[in-house]
Amino acid sequence: MSKEKCSLTGGKEKRGELVRSLAWQHLVKQEEEEAVKKEEKEEGEDEEEEGSDSSSDDPNPEPPCMHPDLLELVVDREKCRKIRRQYRQLIYTVQQNREDIVNTASDTLSEALEEANVLFDGVSRTREAALDAQFLVLASDLGKEKAKQLNTDMNFFNPIAFCDLLLLFVGFNWVEEECKEFSDCDDSIVLSFWGMLHEEATSWMLQAETFHFIFGSFKAERSARKPRLGCHKRACKMEGSGDMPTKLRRLDVHANQETTEKEVERILGLLQTYFQKYPDTPVSYFEFVIDPNSFSRTVENIFYVSFIIRDGFARIRLDQDRLPILEPTNVSQVDDESDSYSYCRKQGVISLSLQDWKNIVSTFEISEAMIKNSY
Amino acid sequence: MLQKPRGRGRPSTQADPERDWGGAGEEGPSTSRAAGGSSQGSRASLSAPTVGPRTQKQLELKVAELVQFLLIKDQKKIPIKRTDILKHVVGDYRDVYPNLLKLAAERLQYVFGYKLVELEPKSHSYILINMLEPVEADAEMRGDQGTPISGLLMIVLGLIFMKGNTITETEVWDFLRRLGVYPTKKHLIFGDPKKLITEDFVRQRYLEYRRIPHTDPVDYELQWGPRTNLETSKMKVLKFVAKVHNQDPKDWPTQYCEALADEESRARPATASAPATSS
């Protein structure tokens, strides 16, 4: 009995050494106190538990005098509690010093293991053995990390150097001088740093470029939160259909052609009404085709008007300012000149960039499209 | 439309689909001609007895839908699940699903140079990877492609590989903090960096993120996910790290040997991950 006690106190002393050997002196006291508090709490719980144990034992028809076996059990309990406390203390200490144990080449881990070994000599019940196992798991985990540490030591890979080199790599060797922390830097520097790194990184990956529609896809509006249980199913359906894009009814090449013809006819109609209204003033080509609100509509209009010109319903001419104008081809006015125009086919290419379009809109101060949407 | 598979023994079974395929080839719209090469090859495989009287046009349309679906799904870079493909695109064409997928994969390859790959064998989720080796000049052509997150991803991948294929989350943040990226602070480019790394990259399967057991305080570890191995390789990441260091990859012998072994094992099973073969 006394021998055991001796070994136990020995363990305690060793723990003291362990604590001292680790570099966290200023924290020791505080943590120790906390640990003690924590333990006291746990002890309290133990006490309660055991108290209830004994109380459940009480009703047993034991003789009132203390049986010697029972007496020893009580002693055992005291001892077990002590062992548990020591185990917990050990686990706590090792846990707290995880970093030091992993990163320094000290024997702390093996010392802790030895201590646990000593403690295990006194273990007789499952409860204490479970704590021993818990410690062992922790210790082996640390061992694994230590082994990994050893590995990286051999590899000479230094993250801190890597970080500095990253900055250098992008050409930011002056960063350290100008601002102490990278996070203090200007937004534009942050943007260009990650932008350049992104470019470099993409050349090392086979990432598929993502596919996007030029004008984006339809906005998937969040469907209204599902109505509460009471609501009708039909209501849900109505809500759901709000998310769907309008379905294309028919996709047919012929149908497409028809719409072109229709559009050409419609625009010809517009042009002819204009000519009837103002028979003497030719219409400016740009003012006619440009839709100030839509570049694509403008391009479409140019396309349709080209049919009108080809079919000889109107012609394009340059006025005195060398700007294109549209004028009617008067059938009654067939003189030699117009004859030669209509029979000698000329081809012209019109180029119009988005910027041209913008410039024309602003120069001609076009605020409204002459060709309005038919739909 | 008749969906039920017809009896194998009946002589008409062979002729029917054959006629459908052939007939539609002449009437089909011009778009179907563009894919003439692939439909030729598919005719034989698709004339399986289960094919109902579907015209080639219908099947072509289905393949086109599937291609579009895959491209749009790829926007978020989250692996595309087979169940989603079946639910949203394939529908009644379930019986010819493997062939539809094969044709879609062929077309993605012809038109876009993308390869449809099953993320992991038998995982039934797919990703698109670029088959064309990146060219330096491409970077300028690429234009604005959303947030430039690849650099961050590459750094994390590099750290993981150089540190022996596993790294704790704490280590990652210790590193990124030096580059002005904090787990709890909103970043100009990355928004919520913690979410980006531990959720978005994980869902895209670039990274694996799991709790390290028996740590107090709790810590997590990061490893490469399956997508990383498909889009890049140990050797490429090592070369990236080496380029940043302005050193030779061989200066890290352990990593170099590992990367070399990885290259060799890649070279051996050539078509193991192709989706078509798994069907």
UniProtKB/Swiss-Prot annotation, chain A:
Region (Disordered): 30-68
One of the GO BP terms on file: DNA repair
Segments forming a coiled coil: 23-51
Start-end of Acidic residues biased regions: 42-60
Lineage: superkingdom: Eukaryota
Subcellular location: Nucleus; Cytoplasm; Chromosome, Telomere
InterPro entries, per database record: Nse4/EID, Nse4_C, Nse4_Nse3-bd
A GO CC term assigned to this protein in UniProt: Smc5-Smc6 complex
Alphabetically ordered keywords of this record: Chromosome, Coiled coil, Cytoplasm, DNA damage, DNA recombination, DNA repair, Nucleus, Repressor, Telomere, Transcription, Transcription regulation
Self-association state and partner proteins as the record states: Component of the SMC5-SMC6 complex which consists at least of SMC5, SMC6, NSMCE2, NSMCE1, NSMCE4A or EID3 and NSMCE3; EID3 seems to be a testis-specific subunit. NSMCE1, NSMCE4A or EID3 and NSMCE3 probably form a subcomplex that bridges the head domains of the SMC5:SMC6 heterodimer. Homodimer, and heterodimer with EID2. Interacts with the C-terminal region of CREBBP.
Protein purpose: Tissue-specific component of the SMC5-SMC6 complex, a complex involved in repair of DNA double-strand breaks by homologous recombination. The complex may promote sister chromatid homologous recombination by recruiting the SMC1-SMC3 cohesin complex to double-strand breaks. The complex is required for telomere maintenance via recombination and mediates sumoylation of shelterin complex (telosome) components.
Family membership: Belongs to the NSE4 family.
PANTHER family reported for this sequence: EP300-INTERACTING INHIBITOR OF DIFFERENTIATION 3, NON-STRUCTURAL MAINTENANCE OF CHROMOSOMES ELEMENT 4
UniProt name for this protein: EP300-interacting inhibitor of differentiation 3
Originating species: Mus musculus
Curated annotation (Swiss-Prot), chain B:
Domain MAGE residue range list: 59-259
Low complexity bias spans: 30-48
The keyword DNA damage appears for this protein: yes
Subcellular location: Cytoplasm; Nucleus; Chromosome, Telomere
Entry-linked Gene3D superfamilies: MAGE homology domain, winged helix WH1 motif, MAGE homology domain, winged helix WH2 motif
Gene Ontology biological process terms from the UniProt entry: cellular response to hydroxyurea; cellular response to radiation; cellular response to UV; DNA recombination; DNA repair; positive regulation of protein ubiquitination; regulation of DNA-templated transcription
Region (Disordered): 1-52
UniProt keyword annotations, A-Z: Chromosome, Cytoplasm, DNA damage, DNA recombination, DNA repair, Growth regulation, Nucleus, Phosphoprotein, Telomere, Tumor antigen, Ubl conjugation pathway
Annotated GO MF terms: protein dimerization activity
Annotated region described as Interaction with NSMCE1, given as residue ranges: 52-279
Tissue: Ubiquitous.
InterPro entries in UniProt: MAGE, MAGE_WH1, MAGE_WH2, MHD_dom
Residue numbers carrying Phosphoserine: S38
Chief localization: cytoplasm
A GO cellular-component term linked to this record: chromosome, telomeric region
Main function: Component of the SMC5-SMC6 complex, a complex involved in repair of DNA double-strand breaks by homologous recombination. The complex may promote sister chromatid homologous recombination by recruiting the SMC1-SMC3 cohesin complex to double-strand breaks. The complex is required for telomere maintenance via recombination in ALT (alternative lengthening of telomeres) cell lines and mediates sumoylation of shelterin complex (telosome) components which is proposed to lead to shelterin complex disassembly in ALT-associated PML bodies (APBs). In vitro enhances ubiquitin ligase activity of NSMCE1.
Subunit note: Component of the SMC5-SMC6 complex which consists at least of SMC5, SMC6, NSMCE2, NSMCE1, NSMCE4A or EID3 and NSMCE3. NSMCE1, NSMCE4A or EID3 and NSMCE3 probably form a subcomplex that bridges the head domains of the SMC5:SMC6 heterodimer. Interacts with PJA1. Interacts with E2F1 (via C-terminus). Interacts with NGFR (via C-terminus). Interacts with NSMCE1. Interacts with NSMCE4. Interacts with SMC6. Interacts with EID3.
PANTHER family per record: MELANOMA-ASSOCIATED ANTIGEN MAGE ANTIGEN, NON-STRUCTURAL MAINTENANCE OF CHROMOSOMES ELEMENT 3 HOMOLOG
Protein name per the record: Non-structural maintenance of chromosomes element 3 homolog
The organism's taxonomic lineage, starting at the top: Eukaryota, Metazoa, Chordata, Craniata, Vertebrata
